[in-house]
Amino acid sequence: MLQAIYNETKDLMQKSIQALNRDFSTLRSAKVSVNILDHIKVDYYGTPTALNQVGSVMSLDATTLQISPWEKNLLKEIERSIQEANIGVNPNNDGETIKLFFPPMTTEQRKLIAKDAKAMGEKAKVAVRNTRQDANNKVKKLEKDKEISEDESKKAQEQIQKITDEAIKKIDESVKNKEDAILKV
């Protein structure tokens, strides 16, 4: 019964870490990633569709992305969606593909993006702490219902704290690695 609480807690905390890493993939670092376009939706015959579902997106070099739509009539719609997304670039439509030329980041931009990464890390830590609180509440309820002793409850809460500390450590490492990647010139 306690093991089930531990396993559920670990799973939920792991999901918070995975969500953080997904969020990090949308942040720009020294090299532009195709993931920066993940949140962009294109109007595909009246349905908002992910950009990578209507064409191939590839990185040509550290500052250039190319989008090759599977249907050429989508070029204008893709171009409009990118402009509306306000990601800091103007799409260059050559009639076959759309190229996005990202300017090199200034030191100030790098600091702002690093600050965003830190904020994302804090949000993930809050999610982990909320998971810890939920797990501790379950343990306290078991103790209150006399299903476990007070000693077992204390040990369980200590175990939950260890799981939480591990998750927080992983989040801190992820944030530090992302900040280093962003601030690296």
From Swiss-Prot:
MF term (GO), any: ribosomal large subunit binding
Pfam families per the UniProt record, alphabetical: RRF
GO BP term, example: cytoplasmic translational termination
Keywords annotated in UniProt: Cytoplasm, Protein biosynthesis
Stretches the record annotates as Disordered: 128-158
Name of encoding gene: frr
Protein name: Ribosome-recycling factor
Species this protein is from: Helicobacter pylori (strain J99 / ATCC 700824)
UniProt xrefs under InterPro entries: Ribosome_recyc_fac, Ribosome_recyc_fac_dom, RRF_sf
Family statement: Belongs to the RRF family.
NCBIfam families: frr
Domain of life: Bacteria
Annotated compartments: Cytoplasm
Function: Responsible for the release of ribosomes from messenger RNA at the termination of protein biosynthesis. May increase the efficiency of translation by recycling ribosomes from one round of translation to another.
Cellular component aspect of the GO annotation: cytosol
